[in-house]
Protein backbone atom coordinates (compact mmCIF):
# COMPACT_ATOMS: atom_id res chain seq x y z
CA UNK A 1 0.00 0.00 0.00
CA UNK A 2 1.52 3.28 -1.07
CA UNK A 3 2.00 5.87 1.67
CA UNK A 4 0.60 9.36 1.23
CA UNK A 5 3.43 11.88 1.21
CA UNK A 6 3.06 15.05 3.25
CA UNK A 7 4.95 18.28 2.87
CA UNK A 8 6.05 18.91 6.44
CA UNK A 9 7.63 22.23 5.52
CA UNK A 10 4.32 23.42 4.08
CA UNK A 11 2.45 22.21 7.19
CA UNK A 12 4.69 24.31 9.45
CA UNK A 13 4.88 27.16 6.95
CA UNK A 14 8.68 27.27 6.83
CA UNK A 15 11.15 27.13 3.93
CA UNK A 16 13.17 23.96 3.27
CA UNK A 17 16.35 25.62 4.55
CA UNK A 18 14.71 26.76 7.80
CA UNK A 19 16.86 26.70 10.92
CA UNK A 20 15.90 24.70 14.02
CA UNK A 21 15.00 27.95 15.77
CA UNK A 22 12.63 28.94 12.92
CA UNK A 23 11.02 25.49 13.00
CA UNK A 24 10.53 25.70 16.77
CA UNK A 25 8.96 29.18 16.53
CA UNK A 26 6.58 28.03 13.82
CA UNK A 27 5.60 24.98 15.88
CA UNK A 28 4.88 27.04 19.00
CA UNK A 29 2.71 29.45 17.03
CA UNK A 30 0.74 26.73 15.22
CA UNK A 31 0.01 24.49 18.23
CA UNK A 32 -1.49 27.47 20.02
CA UNK A 33 -3.48 28.46 16.93
CA UNK A 34 -4.80 24.93 16.20
CA UNK A 35 -5.27 23.55 19.70
CA UNK A 36 -8.60 21.65 19.61
CA UNK A 37 -9.86 23.42 22.73
CA UNK A 38 -9.77 26.69 20.79
CA UNK A 39 -12.03 25.29 18.01
CA UNK A 40 -15.04 23.69 19.75
CA UNK A 41 -17.24 24.33 16.73
CA UNK A 42 -14.85 22.49 14.37
CA UNK A 43 -12.97 20.22 16.75
CA UNK A 44 -12.47 17.29 14.36
CA UNK A 45 -10.67 19.41 11.75
CA UNK A 46 -8.58 21.10 14.47
CA UNK A 47 -7.55 17.71 15.90
CA UNK A 48 -6.45 16.52 12.46
CA UNK A 49 -4.51 19.73 11.83
CA UNK A 50 -3.01 19.53 15.33
CA UNK A 51 -1.79 15.97 14.69
CA UNK A 52 -0.21 17.00 11.38
CA UNK A 53 1.63 19.85 13.10
CA UNK A 54 2.92 17.46 15.78
CA UNK A 55 4.01 14.92 13.17
CA UNK A 56 5.77 17.55 11.06
CA UNK A 57 7.61 18.93 14.07
CA UNK A 58 8.71 15.46 15.22
CA UNK A 59 10.41 14.91 11.87
CA UNK A 60 11.86 18.36 11.13
CA UNK A 61 13.15 18.94 14.67
CA UNK A 62 15.20 15.72 14.53
CA UNK A 63 18.28 16.17 12.26
CA UNK A 64 18.40 12.46 11.40
CA UNK A 65 14.73 12.16 10.54
CA UNK A 66 14.83 15.46 8.67
CA UNK A 67 17.78 14.22 6.57
CA UNK A 68 15.82 11.10 5.61
CA UNK A 69 12.73 13.15 4.80
CA UNK A 70 14.73 15.58 2.63
CA UNK A 71 16.26 12.69 0.67
CA UNK A 72 13.29 10.34 0.29
CA UNK A 73 10.23 12.42 1.13
CA UNK A 74 9.07 10.26 4.04
CA UNK A 75 10.10 8.87 7.42
CA UNK A 76 9.25 5.38 8.66
CA UNK A 77 8.70 2.38 6.42
CA UNK A 78 11.01 2.19 3.46
CA UNK A 79 9.84 1.89 -0.15
CA UNK A 80 10.21 -1.27 -2.21
CA UNK A 81 13.03 -1.03 -4.78
CA UNK A 82 13.15 -2.82 -8.09
CA UNK A 83 15.88 -5.48 -8.25
CA UNK A 84 18.30 -5.22 -11.17
CA UNK A 85 21.00 -7.52 -12.49
CA UNK A 86 23.78 -5.05 -11.59
CA UNK A 87 24.55 -4.59 -7.91
CA UNK A 88 25.33 -0.89 -8.23
CA UNK A 89 21.82 0.34 -7.52
CA UNK A 90 21.48 -1.72 -4.34
CA UNK A 91 24.96 -0.73 -3.21
CA UNK A 92 23.90 2.91 -3.45
CA UNK A 93 20.77 2.22 -1.43
CA UNK A 94 22.78 0.39 1.25
CA UNK A 95 25.17 3.32 1.51
CA UNK A 96 22.27 5.74 1.85
CA UNK A 97 20.89 3.72 4.79
CA UNK A 98 24.27 3.57 6.52
CA UNK A 99 24.99 7.28 5.95
CA UNK A 100 21.65 8.44 7.27
CA UNK A 101 20.97 5.97 10.11
CA UNK A 102 24.49 4.86 11.03
CA UNK A 103 22.99 1.34 10.97
CA UNK A 104 24.21 -1.78 9.27
CA UNK A 105 21.92 -2.68 6.36
CA UNK A 106 21.54 -6.21 7.74
CA UNK A 107 19.95 -4.72 10.85
CA UNK A 108 17.28 -3.32 8.57
CA UNK A 109 16.69 -6.64 6.76
CA UNK A 110 16.94 -9.03 9.71
CA UNK A 111 16.06 -6.84 12.69
CA UNK A 112 18.25 -5.74 15.57
CA UNK A 113 20.83 -8.23 16.73
CA UNK A 114 20.58 -9.84 20.19
CA UNK A 115 21.97 -7.61 22.93
CA UNK A 116 21.75 -4.50 20.77
CA UNK A 117 20.51 -1.49 22.74
CA UNK A 118 17.26 0.15 21.78
CA UNK A 119 17.39 3.78 20.81
CA UNK A 120 15.45 5.77 23.41
CA UNK A 121 14.92 9.49 23.63
CA UNK A 122 14.88 9.61 27.41
CA UNK A 123 17.23 10.18 30.36
CA UNK A 124 20.36 11.01 28.38
CA UNK A 125 23.21 12.86 30.08
CA UNK A 126 23.80 16.46 29.05
CA UNK A 127 26.90 17.55 27.17
CA UNK A 128 30.02 18.81 28.91
CA UNK A 129 30.95 22.48 28.42
CA UNK A 130 34.57 23.57 28.01
CA UNK A 131 35.48 27.05 29.27
CA UNK A 132 38.91 28.73 29.25
CA UNK A 133 39.89 30.99 32.13
CA UNK A 134 43.00 33.18 32.41
CA UNK A 135 44.86 33.63 35.71
CA UNK A 136 47.86 35.72 36.73
CA UNK A 137 50.92 34.75 38.76
CA UNK A 138 49.47 36.57 41.75
CA UNK A 139 46.40 34.29 41.50
CA UNK A 140 48.72 31.30 41.85
CA UNK A 141 50.14 32.40 45.23
CA UNK A 142 47.10 31.62 47.38
CA UNK A 143 44.69 30.40 44.72
CA UNK A 144 41.79 32.52 43.53
CA UNK A 145 38.01 32.62 43.16
CA UNK A 146 37.18 33.92 39.71
CA UNK A 147 33.62 34.79 38.55
CA UNK A 148 32.64 33.39 35.15
CA UNK A 149 29.58 33.75 32.92
CA UNK A 150 28.58 31.30 30.21
CA UNK A 151 25.52 29.88 28.45
CA UNK A 152 24.19 26.40 29.08
CA UNK A 153 21.00 24.41 28.59
CA UNK A 154 18.97 24.04 31.78
CA UNK A 155 15.97 21.88 32.57
CA UNK A 156 12.84 23.51 31.16
CA UNK A 157 10.89 25.06 34.07
CA UNK A 158 7.57 24.64 32.27
CA UNK A 159 7.69 20.88 31.65
CA UNK A 160 10.35 19.83 34.16
CA UNK A 161 12.49 18.32 31.42
CA UNK A 162 9.88 15.91 30.03
CA UNK A 163 9.33 17.87 26.82
CA UNK A 164 5.57 17.46 27.26
CA UNK A 165 3.15 20.35 27.65
CA UNK A 166 1.82 20.28 31.25
CA UNK A 167 -1.38 18.21 31.62
CA UNK A 168 -1.20 17.14 27.96
CA UNK A 169 -0.21 13.55 28.72
CA UNK A 170 0.73 10.86 26.21
CA UNK A 171 -0.98 8.94 23.46
CA UNK A 172 -0.19 5.64 21.80
CA UNK A 173 2.39 6.05 19.08
CA UNK A 174 0.57 5.91 15.73
CA UNK A 175 3.61 4.42 13.98
CA UNK A 176 3.81 1.27 16.12
CA UNK A 177 0.32 1.21 17.62
CA UNK A 178 1.72 1.49 21.14
CA UNK A 179 3.91 -1.63 20.95
CA UNK A 180 7.23 0.21 20.62
CA UNK A 181 8.21 -2.13 17.75
CA UNK A 182 7.88 -1.91 13.97
CA UNK A 183 7.28 -5.11 12.02
CA UNK A 184 8.67 -5.05 8.50
CA UNK A 185 8.29 -7.41 5.58
CA UNK A 186 11.04 -7.09 2.98
CA UNK A 187 12.35 -8.55 -0.18
CA UNK A 188 16.13 -8.85 -0.49
CA UNK A 189 18.76 -10.74 -2.45
CA UNK A 190 18.20 -13.68 -0.08
CA UNK A 191 14.45 -13.92 -0.36
CA UNK A 192 11.45 -12.61 1.57
CA UNK A 193 12.05 -11.68 5.21
CA UNK A 194 10.06 -10.48 8.20
CA UNK A 195 11.91 -8.39 10.79
CA UNK A 196 11.26 -6.28 13.85
CA UNK A 197 12.98 -3.10 14.97
CA UNK A 198 12.57 -0.44 17.61
CA UNK A 199 10.08 2.24 16.62
CA UNK A 200 12.10 5.35 15.86
CA UNK A 201 9.22 7.73 16.43
CA UNK A 202 8.64 6.80 20.10
CA UNK A 203 12.08 5.35 20.87
CA UNK A 204 10.54 1.99 21.81
CA UNK A 205 8.27 3.34 24.56
CA UNK A 206 5.04 3.01 22.59
CA UNK A 207 4.00 6.51 23.66
CA UNK A 208 4.44 10.00 22.25
CA UNK A 209 3.43 13.33 23.79
CA UNK A 210 -0.06 14.50 22.99
CA UNK A 211 1.43 17.98 22.79
CA UNK A 212 5.03 19.19 23.03
CA UNK A 213 6.00 21.81 25.61
CA UNK A 214 5.44 25.36 24.35
CA UNK A 215 8.50 26.65 26.21
CA UNK A 216 11.21 24.23 25.00
CA UNK A 217 9.55 22.80 21.90
CA UNK A 218 9.82 19.25 23.23
CA UNK A 219 13.56 19.13 23.98
CA UNK A 220 13.09 19.47 27.75
CA UNK A 221 15.83 22.12 27.86
CA UNK A 222 16.11 25.90 27.55
CA UNK A 223 19.19 28.06 27.00
CA UNK A 224 20.15 30.27 29.94
CA UNK A 225 23.09 32.45 31.04
CA UNK A 226 24.83 31.16 34.15
CA UNK A 227 27.08 33.01 36.60
CA UNK A 228 29.24 31.09 39.02
CA UNK A 229 32.55 31.33 40.87
CA UNK A 230 35.40 28.99 39.95
CA UNK A 231 37.98 28.16 42.61
CA UNK A 232 41.53 28.05 41.23
CA UNK A 233 43.98 26.08 43.42
CA UNK A 234 47.45 27.53 44.12
CA UNK A 235 50.21 27.08 41.50
CA UNK A 236 48.20 25.28 38.83
CA UNK A 237 50.05 24.58 35.61
CA UNK A 238 49.06 26.15 32.31
CA UNK A 239 46.54 23.86 30.58
CA UNK A 240 45.26 22.28 33.81
CA UNK A 241 41.64 21.11 33.47
CA UNK A 242 39.29 21.49 36.43
CA UNK A 243 36.05 19.48 36.29
CA UNK A 244 32.97 20.96 37.98
CA UNK A 245 30.37 18.22 38.30
CA UNK A 246 26.93 19.23 37.07
CA UNK A 247 28.12 22.54 35.65
CA UNK A 248 27.45 21.57 32.02
CA UNK A 249 24.26 21.26 29.96
CA UNK A 250 21.07 19.75 31.34
CA UNK A 251 20.35 16.17 30.38
CA UNK A 252 17.71 15.20 27.87
CA UNK A 253 14.28 14.30 29.25
CA UNK A 254 15.34 14.36 32.90
CA UNK A 255 18.83 12.93 32.40
CA UNK A 256 21.74 14.18 34.55
CA UNK A 257 23.63 17.39 33.85
CA UNK A 258 26.98 17.26 32.10
CA UNK A 259 30.10 18.81 33.63
CA UNK A 260 31.82 22.17 33.26
CA UNK A 261 35.45 21.66 32.29
CA UNK A 262 37.52 24.74 33.11
CA UNK A 263 40.82 24.99 31.22
CA UNK A 264 43.28 27.18 33.12
CA UNK A 265 45.57 29.45 31.12
CA UNK A 266 48.35 31.18 33.08
CA UNK A 267 48.87 34.68 31.71
CA UNK A 268 52.57 35.19 30.93
CA UNK A 269 54.30 37.73 33.19
CA UNK A 270 57.14 39.44 31.27
CA UNK A 271 59.05 39.99 34.52
CA UNK A 272 59.41 36.33 35.47
CA UNK A 273 60.13 32.91 34.07
CA UNK A 274 58.32 30.06 35.81
CA UNK A 275 60.29 26.93 36.73
CA UNK A 276 58.05 24.64 38.77
CA UNK A 277 57.41 26.49 42.04
CA UNK A 278 60.47 28.73 41.49
CA UNK A 279 60.42 32.05 39.65
CA UNK A 280 63.41 33.47 37.78
CA UNK A 281 64.01 37.22 37.53
CA UNK A 282 66.81 38.83 35.48
CA UNK A 283 68.40 42.11 36.57
CA UNK A 284 71.17 44.06 34.82
CA UNK A 285 73.57 46.32 36.74
CA UNK A 286 76.38 48.63 35.65
CA UNK A 287 79.98 47.33 35.87
CA UNK A 288 80.75 49.98 38.48
CA UNK A 289 77.83 48.72 40.60
CA UNK A 290 79.23 45.21 40.30
CA UNK A 291 82.65 46.47 41.43
CA UNK A 292 81.50 48.76 44.23
CA UNK A 293 78.28 47.01 45.28
CA UNK A 294 74.71 48.29 45.16
CA UNK A 295 71.11 47.60 46.14
CA UNK A 296 68.45 46.70 43.53
CA UNK A 297 64.66 46.58 43.70
CA UNK A 298 63.15 43.16 42.86
CA UNK A 299 59.39 42.78 42.13
CA UNK A 300 57.39 40.09 43.93
CA UNK A 301 54.76 37.92 42.15
CA UNK A 302 52.02 38.83 44.65
CA UNK A 303 52.71 42.53 44.15
CA UNK A 304 55.08 44.98 45.78
CA UNK A 305 58.88 44.75 45.80
CA UNK A 306 61.80 43.73 47.99
CA UNK A 307 65.34 45.13 48.13
CA UNK A 308 68.30 42.89 47.22
CA UNK A 309 71.81 43.89 48.32
CA UNK A 310 74.49 43.25 45.67
CA UNK A 311 77.88 42.96 47.41
CA UNK A 312 81.05 44.61 45.97
CA UNK A 313 82.91 42.47 43.45
CA UNK A 314 79.83 40.63 42.21
CA UNK A 315 80.71 38.68 39.08
CA UNK A 316 78.57 38.58 35.91
CA UNK A 317 75.83 35.90 35.95
CA UNK A 318 75.89 35.59 39.74
CA UNK A 319 72.69 34.00 41.05
CA UNK A 320 70.92 35.13 44.22
CA UNK A 321 68.13 33.08 45.76
CA UNK A 322 65.33 34.72 47.75
CA UNK A 323 63.90 31.88 49.83
CA UNK A 324 60.13 31.44 49.97
CA UNK A 325 59.38 34.23 47.49
CA UNK A 326 58.31 31.95 44.64
CA UNK A 327 55.06 30.01 44.08
CA UNK A 328 53.55 27.40 46.41
CA UNK A 329 54.09 23.74 45.52
CA UNK A 330 51.51 20.96 45.89
CA UNK A 331 52.20 20.77 49.63
CA UNK A 332 51.70 24.51 50.15
CA UNK A 333 55.39 25.34 50.56
CA UNK A 334 56.57 28.29 48.48
CA UNK A 335 59.48 27.99 46.11
CA UNK A 336 62.24 30.57 45.66
CA UNK A 337 62.66 33.75 43.65
CA UNK A 338 65.92 33.33 41.74
CA UNK A 339 67.64 36.56 40.69
CA UNK A 340 70.17 36.35 37.85
CA UNK A 341 72.55 39.32 37.86
CA UNK A 342 73.91 40.44 34.50
CA UNK A 343 76.71 43.02 34.35
CA UNK A 344 76.66 45.57 31.54
CA UNK A 345 80.09 46.59 30.17
CA UNK A 346 79.99 49.93 28.31
CA UNK A 347 81.05 49.87 24.67
CA UNK A 348 82.16 53.51 24.64
CA UNK A 349 83.79 55.75 27.29
CA UNK A 350 84.30 59.47 27.61
CA UNK A 351 87.87 60.83 27.76
CA UNK A 352 87.56 61.42 31.47
CA UNK A 353 86.26 57.89 32.11
CA UNK A 354 89.00 56.36 30.00
CA UNK A 355 91.70 58.42 31.79
CA UNK A 356 90.43 57.30 35.20
CA UNK A 357 90.38 53.65 34.16
CA UNK A 358 93.85 53.83 32.56
CA UNK A 359 95.28 55.33 35.76
CA UNK A 360 93.57 52.59 37.76
CA UNK A 361 94.97 49.94 35.43
CA UNK A 362 98.53 51.29 35.91
CA UNK A 363 98.13 51.21 39.69
CA UNK A 364 96.93 47.60 39.55
CA UNK A 365 99.60 46.58 37.04
CA UNK A 366 97.05 45.61 34.41
CA UNK A 367 98.29 45.59 30.81
CA UNK A 368 95.96 47.43 28.41
CA UNK A 369 96.00 48.68 24.83
From Swiss-Prot:
This is Chaperone protein DnaJ. CDD domains: DnaJ, DnaJ_C, DnaJ_zf. It holds the Pfam family DnaJ. Transmembrane segments: none annotated. It comes from Thermotoga petrophila (strain ATCC BAA-488 / DSM 13995 / JCM 10881 / RKU-1). Participates actively in the response to hyperosmotic and heat shock by preventing the aggregation of stress-denatured proteins and by disaggregating proteins, also in an autonomous, DnaK-independent fashion. Unfolded proteins bind initially to DnaJ; upon interaction with the DnaJ-bound protein, DnaK hydrolyzes its bound ATP, resulting in the formation of a stable complex. GrpE releases ADP from DnaK; ATP binding to DnaK triggers the release of the substrate protein, thus completing the reaction cycle. Its main location: cytoplasm. GO terms for molecular function: ATP binding; heat shock protein binding; unfolded protein binding; zinc ion binding.
Amino acid sequence: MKREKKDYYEILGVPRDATQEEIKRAYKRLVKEWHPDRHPENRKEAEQRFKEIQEAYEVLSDPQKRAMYDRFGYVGEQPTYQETESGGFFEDIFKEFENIFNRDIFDVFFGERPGQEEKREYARRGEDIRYEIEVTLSDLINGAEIPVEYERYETCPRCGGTGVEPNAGYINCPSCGGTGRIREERRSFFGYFVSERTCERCGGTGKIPREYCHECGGSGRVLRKVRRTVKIPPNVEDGTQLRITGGGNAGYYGGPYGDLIVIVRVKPDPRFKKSGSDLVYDVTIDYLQAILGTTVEVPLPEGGTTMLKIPPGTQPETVFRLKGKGLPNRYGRRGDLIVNVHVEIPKTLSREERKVLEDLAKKRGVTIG
